[in-house]
Amino acid sequence: MSSLSKEAELVHEALLARGLETPLRKQELDAETRKTRIQEHMTQVMQLLNLDLSDDSLADTPRRIAKMYVDEIFSGLDYENFPKITLIENKMKVDEMVTVRDITLTSTCEHHFVTIDGKATVAYIPKDSVIGLSKINRIVQFFAQRPQVQERLTQQILLALQTLLGTNNVAVSIDAVHYCVKARGIRDATSATTTTSLGGLFKSSQNTRQEFLRAVRHNG
């Protein structure tokens, strides 16, 4: 991983140490080769479904899916895509909660490869540094762009921010609809899943925790 940014390496190592990294094999193929291989296999899948790939509506679908997987919805599997992080010295000595609400995220259930659609609320109490606000959104999106389970996604975002900011005082909550529940199986179209991960004062201080949870309840 020598080509990765320092921040990407730190986050990846922290997740590995805590057993929170997405199960990954060593990457041996470049992006274009992976797209070619996925296209070939998706062609076979569609043929096994008795779809006629000579139809002009379907002919390019395997290529589109391969490109979507590698460049878009699973781009977070490659730490070369980890967002560039801007940290700013906390010269103003900010010591109150900073909260970013209504962060939209779209991920993919790793059990059925269907959509997870939701919103995240992220808060932290600055220590020596503050982070550019859009970087929080980008970190959420990076980890969402993987096959995921919501519990792990929530904890990955938390640990990434704790690692980058040098503080345990971080909290993350995600509320999401799982299409593996909505579109198949039980086919419950109205249920949603909420996961929360708390660190530092958000866990140990009832007042801090309640302040964060009030922000979560105001979501949407």
Curated annotation (Swiss-Prot):
Alphabetical keyword list: GTP-binding, Hydrolase, Metal-binding, Nucleotide-binding, One-carbon metabolism, Zinc
InterPro entries, per the entry: GTP-CH-I_C/QueF (IPR043133), GTP-CH-I_N (IPR043134), GTP_CycHdrlase_I (IPR001474), GTP_CycHdrlase_I_CS (IPR018234), GTP_CycHdrlase_I_dom (IPR020602)
Catalytic activity: GTP + H2O = 7,8-dihydroneopterin 3'-triphosphate + formate + H(+)
Domain of life assignment: Bacteria
Gene3D superfamilies tied to this protein: 1.10.286.10, 3.30.1130.10
Pathway: Cofactor biosynthesis; 7,8-dihydroneopterin triphosphate biosynthesis; 7,8-dihydroneopterin triphosphate from GTP: step 1/1
Complexes and interactors: Toroid-shaped homodecamer, composed of two pentamers of five dimers.
Protein name: GTP cyclohydrolase 1
Phylogenetic placement of the source organism: Bacteria, Pseudomonadati, Pseudomonadota, Gammaproteobacteria, Enterobacterales
